[in-house]
Amino acid sequence: MSDIYQHFRKDERAFIDQALEWKRIVQEQYRMKLTDFLDPREQVILSAVTGQADVGLAFSGGYDRAERKRAILFPEYITPEESDFELQAFNVRYADKFVSVDHRSLLGALMGIGLKRQKFGDIVFSETAVQLIVSADTADFVAAQLTQAGKAAVSLEKIDLSDLNIPAVDVEIRDDTVSSLRLDAVCASMSRQSRQKSQTLVKNGLVKVNWKVVEDPSYIVAEGDMLSIRGFGRCSLTKIEGKTKKDKWRVTFERQK
């Protein structure tokens, strides 16, 4: 069983252990296991860990292109329904003629009321609405406690998932080759700049991997990682497809324009 760790980073071992425990519960107790919200990398790990026929796996974040999703692990004779994911969506109401609400202020407000990041999913911005998705067990607490986001007074209105106003997204998918899976090399490819410049950005704390600042240029990235470079934006490393004859890694990036 310990051999599974060699395929992942050392800092991912705690999550691997958690995933193995979820799997054990399903196998031994013959019941579904619902997780908190997982980021894309955690979804990749969970998919790898549960890769056996006797345990099924399904994800939902409330809409098709959701980034953060809850997972259900289930016995093979059970088929989960959407309601089993226990998601609640909200409209965020505020005086938009006088103040604005952005992703950072709303994220900070949710964390500020003591809500753990695992308890809420995507924050969705469209031309007509700001909406968010939380776990159903925290919905009443969030509705009662979230009254301010930045300088804006806010209130929440419960809505059905079908009423989410998901904007159309123009996605750029780009294939490339990189000499290494080091963070500086991948960031250089992702942002189309020199490796030296990428090293400087990493060392200056301007690069995040899965929402955490990483200042080590030699950090090895993995499939499913979300990379963020300040001033450039975010890209998902969606595929790593082995090496070319010239010993370079084939990678695929996905970026929302």
From Swiss-Prot:
Keyword Iron-sulfur recorded: no
Pfam families documented for this protein: S4, YlmH_1st, YlmH_RBD
* Effect upon mutating K197A: Wild-type protein function
**Domain S4 RNA-binding as annotated: residue spans:** 181-251
Q: How does it assemble?
A: In the presence of chloramphenicol (a translation elongation inhibitor), but not erythromycin or lincomycin, associates with 50S ribosomal subunits with or without a tRNA in the P-site. The S4 domain binds in a similar position to RqcP.
What main location does UniProt list? cytoplasm
Q: CDD domains recorded for this chain?
A: S4
Instruction: From the UniProt entry, list the residue stretches annotated as the region Central region.
Output: 87-166
Keywords assigned by UniProt? Cytoplasm, Protein biosynthesis, Ribosome biogenesis, RNA-binding, rRNA-binding, tRNA-binding
User: Which GO terms fall under molecular function for this chain's record?
Assistant: ribosomal large subunit binding; rRNA binding; structural constituent of ribosome; tRNA binding
Q: Does the keyword rRNA-binding apply?
A: yes
What GO cellular-component annotations does this UniProt entry give?
Answer: cytoplasm; RQC complex; small ribosomal subunit
The compartments listed are: Cytoplasm
Substituting R182A results in: Synthetic growth defect with ssrA deletion, no longer associates with 50S ribosomal subunits, does not complement rqcP deletion upon overexpression, does not increase Ala tailing
SMART domains under this entry? Answer: S4
Write down the species: Bacillus subtilis (strain 168)
Q: What is known of its domains?
A: Has 3 domains, an N-terminal domain (NTD) which contacts helix 69 (H69) of the 23S rRNA, the central region which contains an RNA recognition motif (RRM) and the C-terminal S4 domain which interacts with the P-site tRNA and H69. The NTD and central region are required to complement a double ssrA-ylmH deletion and to bind 50S ribosomal subunits. The ribosome binding site of the S4 domain overlaps that of RqcP.
Q: What happens when the gene is disrupted?
A: No alteration in cell division. Has a synthetic lethal phenotype when disrupted simultaneously with trans- translation; double ssrA-ylmH deletions grow poorly at 37 and die at 49 degrees Celsius.
The ranges of region (N-terminal domain) come to 1-74
Lineage top rank: taxon: Bacteria
Q: Which GO terms describe its biological process?
A: rescue of stalled ribosome; ribosomal small subunit biogenesis
What role does this protein play?
Answer: Part of the ribosome quality control system (RQC), a ribosome-associated complex that mediates the extraction of incompletely synthesized nascent chains from stalled ribosomes and their subsequent degradation. RqcH recruits Ala-charged tRNA, and with RqcP directs the elongation of stalled nascent chains on 50S ribosomal subunits, leading to non-templated C-terminal alanine extensions (Ala tail). The Ala tail promotes nascent chain degradation. RqcP2 (YlmH) overexpression can compensate for RqcP's role in Ala tailing during RQC, restoring Ala tail addition to peptides in stalled ribosomes.
- Positions in coiled-coil regions: none
Which gene produces this protein? Answer: rqcP2
What is the name attached to this protein's record? Ribosome-associated protein quality control protein P2
